[in-house]
Structure formats: structure tokens, C-alpha cells
Amino acid sequence: MSVKIRLARRGAKKKPFYRIVAADVESPRDGKFLESVGTYDPMVEPAAIILNEERIRYWMGEGATPTTTVKSILKKQGFSSNPA
């Protein structure tokens, strides 16, 4: 099973809200996920980002790879991608 850390869209039409989740690569975008590791709300200024860094480090240590968008969110938050 290959795992990605990616965004799962929630919210209403024209008002997106995202969960940052660890999910199997074969699961649909908004489908089943293994664990929710944060949230991202782009509709507020500045964007509201909440991360569970401990769990993100755990999943990256287990071999999960973040998507490009999640990588940029983690970088904005000053998150080191090195599992330690």
C-alpha cells in the first residue's frame, strides 16, 4: 500500500475547506483516508493552516509522500521534510 499526504476537499460550492489527510494513492480525492493530519482554509486572509506535525512526521517516516500542494503548505509553515 502506497500512501500520500494530500488535500481532501470539504466545504460548500465556491467556499472550499480542505483536510490534509494521509490516504492510499488508489482512494478517491474525497474518499476513504487513513488519518486526518491537518486542515487548510484558503478563504480567510491569511490562509488558516493547522498541522499535526507529529503525525505528519510519523507518516513520512512510514514512506508517505506529500503532494506538490501539500509540500508548499508545509514549506510555508516552516515544516522540515526530514523525518526525525
From Swiss-Prot:
The UniProt entry, under InterPro entries, shows: Ribosomal_bS16, Ribosomal_bS16_CS, Ribosomal_bS16_dom_sf
The keyword Nuclease belongs to this UniProt entry's keyword annotation:
no
Gene3D superfamilies, per database record: 3.30.1320.10
Assigned keywords, A-Z:
Ribonucleoprotein, Ribosomal protein
Query: A Gene Ontology molecular-function term?
Result: structural constituent of ribosome
**Entry coiled-coil feature ranges:** none
GO cellular component, as recorded: cytoplasm; small ribosomal subunit
Q: Which SUPFAM superfamilies match?
A: Ribosomal protein S16 (SSF54565)
* Pfam families given in the database record: Ribosomal_S16
Q: Give the PANTHER family listed for this entry.
A: 30S RIBOSOMAL PROTEIN S16, SMALL RIBOSOMAL SUBUNIT PROTEIN BS16M
Which HAMAP family does this chain map to?
Ribosomal_bS16 (MF_00385)
> In which family does this protein belong, per the annotation?
Belongs to the bacterial ribosomal protein bS16 family.
| Annotated protein name in UniProt | Small ribosomal subunit protein bS16
Record organism:
Desulforapulum autotrophicum (strain ATCC 43914 / DSM 3382 / VKM B-1955 / HRM2) (Desulfobacterium autotrophicum)
